[in-house]
Design a protein with these regions (language model features):
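Gly/serine-rich nucleotide phosphate-binding loop at the start of the catalytic core
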Residues: 3
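N-terminal core-binding DNA-recognition domain of tyrosine recombinases/integrases
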Residues: 8-21, 28-94
């Protein structure tokens, strides 16, 4: 399954189950993530991809910003594992 498809599923879920600020926060990071990895299959996203992506979008920002964005990506992959495909590995967990 493509990353872009799962991003939409994840965001739709949170639009119905989370607070607006939480949704906006997820949208901000996942839209950027989707621009780079949207056409990739989930299985193709590696830990190295995650670290490179975070370096690009958090360059010059506080460590707390990097942690929050990493946490959002980890939550995204955990959602996939728990709700869509348990065979997927969370690249944030490595």
């Amino acid at each position: 399954m493509k990353v872009s498809k799962v991003i939409e599923i994840f965001l739709d879920y949170h639009r119905n189950h989370s607070r607006p600020n939480t949704v906006r926060s997820y949208e901000a990071i996942l839209k950027k993530f989707g621009l780079i990895f949207g056409d990739k299959d989930l299985e193709e996203v590696s830990s190295e991809d995650i670290l490179t992506f975070l370096s690009k979008i958090t360059d010059g920002r506080k460590q707390q910003t990097r942690r929050i964005r990493y946490s959002h990506l980890s939550a995204f992959f955990n959602f996939i594992i728990n709700n869509i495909d348990e065979r997927i590995q969370n690249p944030c967990a490595n």
